[in-house]
A protein has these predicted regions:
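Short beta-strand
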Residues: 62-65, 100-107, 142-145, 151
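Long, low-complexity interaction regions most often at the N-terminus
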Residues: 3, 10, 124, 137-138, ...
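Short amphipathic beta-strand starts and helix->beta connectors
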Residues: 53-62, 92-100, 224-228
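Conserved NTP-binding/hydrolysis core of motor NTPases
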Residues: 100-101, 109-111, 132-133
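A common structural junction motif
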Residues: 96-98, 130-139
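Modules that initiate DNA replication and primer synthesis
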Residues: 27, 71, 78-81, 87, ...
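DNA replication initiation on ssDNA origins
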Residues: 1-73, 80-89, 155-158, 163-166, ...
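Short secondary-structure junctions
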Residues: 17-21, 98-102, 140-142, 172
Length: 240
């Protein structure tokens, strides 16, 4: 195994007694790539990592929460299909100086990763990413880790990993200009520029002016109010 691949494994370390598997299929009428996914309740081996990076199916998914209820990474899963504007998202992240890595996901949306050098409590990672997702305007997106603690037989939910092929990955990171980082060397360099020592280094920029009309409202509604409601979204926002 190459040094780059070993580093990739270190970056995405998670639960090692279970892992996810995903088998790709064709796109449905909404443009989403359909797939069959399941969890294997057995020890994760190096061969599974190798198979994933070699482009062999099924591809690999990792459960970020470990048996001690900590993790070294988490992600916001923005589930969108063809036409998602990754560059706009990256610009928004950079404007607020958030140390996040954006990857194109299987569906064409984005996996927005937050990496830390030392393990943190899964509950703290989940809370931080929930706050970030709401601030970015994606408060309804799934957050990984989805669990804050595991029982001895529990497995949690997995997230599909990027770099599912050495030459033609469909899931890969994007740099600060939105360009594809289509190999592990480029990804690792980008990771090193974003990883933080602890979650205290990840600060959400406060709004310049408090809107007292929305004081006490959920973060997702405060974000929507500050940016304006899209045409036709009034009823949906009222429902929220």
């Amino acid at each position: 195994m190459t040094e780059q691949r070993r580093r990739f494994i270190e970056i995405f370390t998670g639960l090692d007694r279970a892992y996810g598997q995903t088998e790709s299929r064709s796109k449905n009428e909404n443009g989403k790539l359909e797939a069959k996914s399941w969890i294997e309740k057995q020890q994760l081996t190096e061969q599974k990592w190798e198979d994933h990076l070699d482009g062999k199916e099924p591809s690999l998914g990792i459960i970020p929460i470990k048996d001690d209820n900590t993790c070294t990474w988490g992600a916001i899963d923005i589930d969108s299909y063809d036409g998602f504007d990754h560059k706009k998202l990256i610009k928004q992240i950079l404007e607020n100086k958030l140390p996040l890595v954006v990857c194109k996901s299987k569906s064409g949306g984005a996996h927005v990763f937050l990496f830390v050098k030392e393990s943190v409590k899964a509950v703290d990672m989940q809370m931080k990413l929930t706050e970030i997702a709401a601030w970015l305007g994606y408060g309804e997106s799934e957050i990984f880790p989805k669990q804050i603690e595991l029982n001895p037989k529990g497995t949690g939910n997995f997230l599909n990993l990027p770099y599912n092929h050495p030459e033609y990955p469909t899931r890969y990171a994007l740099d600060d200009e939105g360009n594809a980082l289509d190999n592990l060397d480029m990804f690792i360099t980008h990771y090193e520029s974003k990883v933080v020592s602890n979650l205290g280094m990840v600060a959400i920029k406060k709004k310049e002016r408090e809107n007292t009309d929305w004081k006490g409202a959920p973060p997702c509604l405060v974000t929507l109010a500050s940016r304006g409601f899209a045409q036709g979204s009034r009823n949906e926002c009222l429902f929220q």
